[in-house]
Amino acid sequence: MLTREEFSAILANGPLILDGATGSNLQKAGMPRGCCTEEWILANPEPLVNLQRAYAKAGSRIVYAPTFQAQPIALQALGLDADTEKLNAKLVSLTRAAAPGCLVAGDITTLATFCDSWD
């Protein structure tokens, strides 16, 4: 992981371009709607690897690891919450291998889960 100073030094060299759409491109590559994206990617890594390589080749210097819902609340519904750390490590490793030389960022999405009322 970069320190704040290391990241600031990278930013001082000019703008950093991030990758683009992942989920919709994975669906175009055959990922079914409504599946666990992270689980599908680990079972079918080639579409993600190809996509991330294409983004890196196009000039992206930061590539998101596909960790959108790889957190305990979302994974609990699938019975995978105990594997949260392992899933994230595999997804980050896959991204690092697909886009060497790029920075890898984690990514998280909103949840359709609500907190209990404090009343």
Spans of model-derived segments:
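Domain-level signal for soluble alpha/beta catalytic cores
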Residues: 1-119
